[in-house]
């Protein structure tokens, strides 16, 4: 099979936000060639548009594979309708113009047998040009910023303890549906997730877990491994009677969530990764050891997490973090027992595998803070792009949380929760 890429670039006098408000409506009828269009969802909740073109009876179907409101990019793949196309993947990016207005870049990568490839590419070029022209010439809606939707009423929560080895403590809601389980970072606790827990509980059952050794959970008798964390997730799933899970992680919690997804992809209805994903699984042995030793030095000197919490907060917090946010981050860090912090650190710096993203069969949402020093937008965007490339049928969303540092759900809880709820609402029950 031969491959070819078609690309069309244009400009619009409208702002990038105004153009994106049109383009991001994946099932909107803004393209002049479209006669009819409607939205469908596949079994995983992925968005599919089914449409016909003027003068044709063929029904075309395309699945949204990538969406980023913060980057103003989307990608899609052809499912049916184009005769002879082995594969067909499109991408649209809206950027700021050099002298105001917007730049519009639309491309499609086509794979087909050589005799048919040229005809598909010629037809594609005409379609892309017509779409770019429509976006360039049409007077788009006002550039006024769209008002965010209000968050739903908070769901009631309760604390429970799962007895066993080790004891696990969590806060949960009593809603129905898959279980949305929140996993905190190395310097956090389940309390970091309370705003998201209450919001998610209005969509499905939700729970925030204290990882072993944190908060109300007990530390195991021997050094923890990522397998132990995955077993703890299975215990929570069984205790709460959940058929499927949506894992939501932050930093260390993101690495644990991805590790679980590698082992049990069939159990996950969705995967949400914030401020991390690969952990130290792609770092060299020297890099991992340097990281571990540098963070063990204060512990070996007899300090506790409470002693070095102020220095940690300076790294975690964004430049505009409020005093209240900094105080919350400090309290979370200061409450961690030294043995727990050491245990988590050793586990985190001894990953057992490098992730195979082709195993991620579920919808994935990735987020990070604009000012995250530990998991920068460029890094997390890059990982999301690799998942897009390697997953067999990707359904990926990536967002940068404005004006947030590493613990983006704590610094910008409303912005984080809105994106999370958009993701949860699309998942099948």
Which residues fall in each region the model found?
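A conserved amphipathic terminal alpha-helix motif
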Residues: 103, 108-150
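Hydrophobic-ligand binding "helix-grip"
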Residues: 31-32, 38-41, 54-101, 109-111, ...
């Amino acid at each position: 099979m031969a491959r070819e890429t078609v690309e069309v670039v244009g400009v619009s006098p409208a702002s990038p936000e105004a153009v994106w408000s049109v383009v991001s409506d994946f099932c909107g009828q803004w393209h002049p060639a479209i006669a009819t269009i409607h939205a469908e969802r596949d079994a995983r909740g992925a968005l599919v548009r089914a449409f016909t073109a003027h003068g044709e009876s063929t029904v075309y179907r395309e699945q949204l594979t990538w969406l980023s409101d913060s980057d103003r990019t989307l990608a899609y793949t052809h499912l049916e309708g184009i005769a002879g196309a082995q594969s067909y993947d499109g991408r649209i990016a809206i950027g700021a113009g050099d002298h105001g207005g917007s730049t519009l870049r639309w491309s499609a990568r086509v794979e087909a047998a050589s005799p048919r490839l040229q005809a598909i590419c010629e037809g594609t070029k005409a379609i892309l040009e017509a779409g770019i022209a429509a976006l360039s010439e049409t007077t788009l809606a006002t550039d006024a910023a769209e008002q965010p939707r209000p968050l739903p009423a908070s769901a009631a929560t309760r604390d429970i303890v799962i007895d066993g080895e080790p004891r696990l403590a969590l806060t949960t809601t009593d809603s129905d549906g898959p279980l949305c389980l929140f996993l905190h970072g190395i310097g956090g606790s389940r309390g970091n997730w309370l705003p998201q827990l209450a919001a998610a509980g209005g969509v499905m059952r939700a729970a925030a877990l204290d990882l072993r050794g944190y908060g109300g959970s007990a530390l195991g008798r021997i050094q923890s491994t990522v397998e132990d964390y995955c077993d703890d997730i299975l215990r929570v799933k069984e205790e709460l009677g959940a058929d499927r899970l949506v894992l939501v992680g932050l930093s260390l919690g993101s690495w644990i969530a991805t590790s679980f997804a590698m082992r049990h992809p069939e159990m996950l209805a969705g995967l949400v990764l914030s401020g991390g994903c690969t952990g130290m699984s792609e770092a060299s042995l020297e890099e991992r050891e340097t990281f571990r030793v540098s963070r063990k030095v204060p512990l070996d000197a007899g300090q506790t997490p409470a002693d070095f919490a102020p220095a940690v907060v300076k790294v975690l917090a964004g430049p505009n973090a409020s005093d209240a946010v900094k105080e919350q981050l400090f309290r979370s860090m200061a409450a961690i027992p030294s043995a727990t912090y050491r245990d988590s650190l050793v586990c985190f710096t001894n990953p057992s595998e490098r992730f195979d993203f082709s195993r991620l069969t579920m919808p994935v949402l990735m987020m990070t803070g604009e000012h995250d020093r530990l998991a920068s937008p460029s890094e997390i965007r890059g990982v999301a792009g690799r998942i897009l490339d390697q997953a067999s049928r990707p359904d990926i969303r990536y967002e940068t949380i404005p004006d947030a540092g590493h613990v983006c759900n704590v610094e910008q809880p409303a912005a984080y929760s809105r994106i999370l709820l958009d993701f949860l609402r699309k998942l099948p029950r």
